[in-house]
Amino acid sequence: MSRNQRDSGKAAVDAKINGKPQTNGGAKRGPKIPKDNSKKKKAPPSNTTPTTNQTNLDKLVNQLYDKNSKQGMPQKQQRKKLQEYLSAQVQGTDSATSSSSASGLAPNSFSDSSASEESSDDELGDMTSPSSSSSLSASDSDEMSEYTLSSSTPEVPAIAKTSGARAELKRRNKEKEALAADPNNNRAPPAKNKNAAEGPGPASSNPRIQRRVTMAGDLVHTEPVTGETGALHCPLKRKSVASCPLPAKAKSPNPTQPAKAAPESKAAGSAKSKAPVVPRLKEDAKNKPGPSARGVSPAVDIEITSCISLPSTAGLPASGSKSPAAGKISPKPGTSASAKPSTSASAKPSTSKSSAKSSSDKSNDAAASGPTTSAPAKKKEESSKSGDKAKSKDYHKVNSIEEGRRILQWILNPVQPDEFFGSFWEKNACQVQRQTPKYFAELISFEMIDEMLIRHHLEFTTNIDVTTYKDGVRQTLNPEGRAMPPAVWSSYADGCSIRILNPSTYLAGLRQVCSMLQEFFHCLVGANVYLTPPNSQGFAPHYDDIEAFVLQVEGRKRWRLYMPVKPTDMLARHSSGNFDQGELDEPIFDEVLEAGDVLYFPRGTVHQAITEKDQHSLHITLSVYQQQAYANLLENLMPMVLKNAVQQKMALRRGLPLHTWQNLGLAHGGSEGRSRLNLISGIQQMVQKYLLPTEEQIDAAVDQLAKRFQHEALPPTILPEERVRTVFGSRSQTDAQGQCLCDYEITEQTSVRLLRANILRLVAEEGILRLYYYVDNALEYCKYDANFMEIEPTEAAAVEMLLHSYPAYIKVGQLPLHSGDRRVDVATALWERGLLMTEKPFK
């Protein structure tokens, strides 16, 4: 159609008849006509009469629908409607032309055609409707707007009002420009025409988008989906429960049927009390032995909301109560604990079925569910509510070492820590059966693992291992690259065990438990998570170099413990290789852990675990006291002692006697000559005389072990009560002149204390005093170099006072420094590094 046409609208119909087809659309059956994208020639203006228009219109209709061909009712209806539509289009064009000519504007005309109902989906995606060109100025583009009708209805949309034709053209051009600018070629559905006939709206004008949506369905967008609560959900569609690789949620998470190979005791299997869901305790509740009372720091992994809920002190036994016997602890009410625990390191753990004292099943569950809700308890709770609120405000005054002890007490409940260290620590295995399936449920779950895999970048081998143990062969089947959920769950469905090596990096609740326990043990507390499918075993029998606490979270798992193969393996300093079953004697412990149970065994204990036929297993292994033996201390101490003795004693610098080589050595080991005996005796006396470590040397060696802890430790979890008192809650601003305005000011009247009991260590190295601290450590193990700051020798006394006065607050003016300005400077430097906490918030 000519771009510069200014005649009446009659020429528009003439151009439709004489001009080239604009698109490859149309309802006529037959081979497709390829779309001609070449520039169209200008048609000369022509003057026609209305009669000629009607004749040409009939020709066009007959061309589209051949009268001689056999036509069904749908084709006849479409032909009739198309004829009516084109007739109305001609009339509308005539009126638009006369109106536009009077105003000096060029008319706009649009035409559409419907697609055949029998067209295929691929043809529908590629079809575009023929449209007449608009009479625009020479500077406008001649690109045509495409409009695809829905194949679900034979009706033709009503004609748009002529007065809004130009606005409609502008809107469509904007849509095309936006579509071209979108790199993903995604567009919103076109706005519904108010004048169009009711029915399904038009299909997408981009056939590629239409095909993509048809093929991909709901999985076009695969990024994590955020729910109403803000938590991410896996976008993958899980299979049905019958075929899903994840185990189905059982009605009872803690089946109490005894294991066939390891029958349970009456104490363990008779009481089947219902375990209440662990409630979340209020943040202001004080003296709760766990992170729920303290809360999770908003600044540390705020995206993961896996904070645990730990019990109140009312649910834990008194410090003077008796502990159950060694080997197995089952807190069944109404039984006595008269049996004495075995303390022999080589003796087999006692299998007596003794249990802890308890008044009822409800009191047994108190450690997991918090205070009971009986009427007397409610009265007592209401009466002490005001007192609890007052105490919660002073929670920042607690001792971090005692808080770590309370976490250990929560894990071992009803066993008291003192009894545990006296009877079991490094001596014997200890099993706690509490029949509370939800006891550790908030630490880890399938949902947390799935969310962790989606949200974070975990790598196989670095963060996750896929293992199997079949027919005596242990294999690690780690793929390369990132551990995405489909790959992990596919391996799990194939019967492989999944080991997560550093879950505390990603789960705030588990990290909080580890960070609090490390204050008590003064060593790195590691955590591994093991997910094992039913009737599977992931690891061969072996022993480790750590004190292990196994926390059964879900399912059941049968554990077998064996005596060390060699006496030198007891309290091993390094982990072993894999043992064959034939190398092991009969197990000294063969029991099934159920959800909520705990098993402790010392380092060097050979162990293996397997799931039952119809039960999966999810458990956490907390590892403590790795490389914390006297041997590690002496490895640091004796080189230091020898170096100092050589510098001080000339006798150690003298040369060896000439006859040493003829009397000492492997070849002379059987000799008992006098020269040999004199040489051996002289060396032994020299060691006893010159290589006795001094107090200062022992202190320096211990500082080196403590320095290693500062490098390995997890960063502390900053609680809300602590945040407002530390640099982590500080915010700075600028004034009108651009000067920085801090919201804190430490004076000599400010009361301060250390953030944690073991937050820093004063170490003398190469004649320099350094403060090593772990507050800035990464969540990954030793990702960065150790953090330290150097201080002057005159400032060491101030650090010592802060260490000795903990957990009490002291005024900055009390620090033993020569001037008030120096005291303020030292306190400010420590506070700005996150090592100090003020008694009162600055805000």
UniProtKB/Swiss-Prot annotation:
Recorded coiled-coil stretches: none
Phosphothreonine: residues bearing it: 222, 335
E.C. number(s) listed in UniProt: 1.14.11.-, 1.14.11.27
Pfam families associated with the record: JmjC_2, RIOX1_C_WH
Compositionally biased intervals (Low complexity): 44-56, 95-117, 129-139, 180-197, 258-276, 336-358, 365-376
Gene3D superfamilies xrefs: 3.90.930.40, Cupin, JmjC domain-containing ribosomal oxygenase (ROX), dimer domain
SUPFAM superfamilies for this protein: Clavaminate synthase-like
Family annotation (InterPro entries): JmjC_dom, NO66-like, RIOX1/NO66-like_C_WH
Modification Phosphoserine occurs at: 336
Region (Disordered): 1-299, 311-397
Gene Ontology MF terms: 2-oxoglutarate-dependent dioxygenase activity; histone H3K36 demethylase activity; histone H3K36me/H3K36me2 demethylase activity; histone H3K4me/H3K4me2/H3K4me3 demethylase activity; iron ion binding
Family the entry assigns: Belongs to the ROX family. NO66 subfamily.
Role according to the record: Oxygenase that can act as both a histone lysine demethylase and a ribosomal histidine hydroxylase. Specifically demethylates 'Lys-4' (H3K4me) and 'Lys-36' (H3K36me) of histone H3, thereby playing a central role in histone code.
Protein name, per record: Bifunctional lysine-specific demethylase and histidyl-hydroxylase NO66
Lineage: Eukaryota, Metazoa, Ecdysozoa, Arthropoda, Hexapoda
